[in-house]
Amino acid sequence: AYPIHPEIFDRLYTDWSTLVKFQRTRGVLRLMAAVIHSLWEKGDRNPLILPANVAIDDPRVQSELTRYLSDNWVPVIEKDVDGPNSLPLKLDSELPNLGKFSACRRVARTIYMGSAPTTAAAHKGIEDRRVKLGCVMPGESPAVFGDALRRMASAATYLYQDGPHYWYSTQPTVTKLAED
């Protein structure tokens, strides 16, 4: 499947295929066509396509990722995942050690890919080690993405954590509601 990292196919065939409307073969092909086209248009030079490289800010990709979900995920994406004024972009611009790798944005994309279809499941979310697996390119330090994950978990409105598991929900966290 090179250059597509196996973690993408694991997420699509394990998590996304549980959605009623998501057709395993057609859904995967449609999504990956949109993802590859978006990366090609942007001139992406990464050696692998990881969950972190899925350009959720691209309207075509976003449409493929939200069309199968029952709830309205667009506000979540715009605020906490990959919008032009999103928290990950803000953190990446404020913190050069994270911004050099777009670490917060890559963490947010990976969590979305691994958690959006499983919000109704008993075991929600994606483990922190799978987040790093979906983000880190050869030669990069996993610790940078661990730092980005911690910062995202403490500041994001729709990001939940239970032990090593992280997931997005369409409902804001109680902590963020209390702060607002």
List the model feature ranges, each with a label:
Residues 1-109, 117-126, 133-144, 154-167, ...:
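C-terminal helical "lid" subdomain and adjoining coupling/linker elements of P-loop NTPases
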Residues 146-150:
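Short, hydrophobic-biased segments on the C-terminal half of alpha helices
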